[in-house]
Amino acid sequence: MASGRSLLTGLFVGGIIGGAAVLLTAPSSGKQLREKMKTNYDSFEETIKRLKSDGLALKDQLIKAAKESTDVIKDVGGELQTSIKKWQEEIKPHQQDLQKEIADIEEKIRQLEKTLQN
């Protein structure tokens, strides 16, 4: 926020100095000079208001985007957990079958080793 404020201050001061330098170096009557200064000031003031408005709109958009991304991340996380649980339930019978087959194979290997030792 401080850097944004310094930027605006720099723009403001630079605009005033630049505008004053241009106006004072241009050959004009006093009345024309005052009119040009007022026009330039009004233009500068409008630019500052627009910058402020754009900055606030950007801030609001960033806040909204952050909130939406947080919501999406929560939703995706919940869906992922549900998918993992469903997958685990689906593979449970296969996992049990594989464990039984592995146990059977281990038993057969033990029997073969026993037979070979005799």
Swiss-Prot record:
Segments passing through the bilayer: 7-27
Its membrane topology: Single-pass membrane protein
Cystine residue pairs: none
GO CC annotation, single: plasma membrane
UniProt keyword list: Cell membrane, Coiled coil, Membrane, Transmembrane, Transmembrane helix
Coiled-coil portions: 31-118
Keyword Membrane found: yes
Top-level taxon in the UniProt lineage: Bacteria
PANTHER family assigned: GENERAL STRESS PROTEIN, IG HYPOTHETICAL 17707
Protein name: Uncharacterized membrane protein YhaH
Lineage: Bacteria, Bacillati, Bacillota, Bacilli, Bacillales
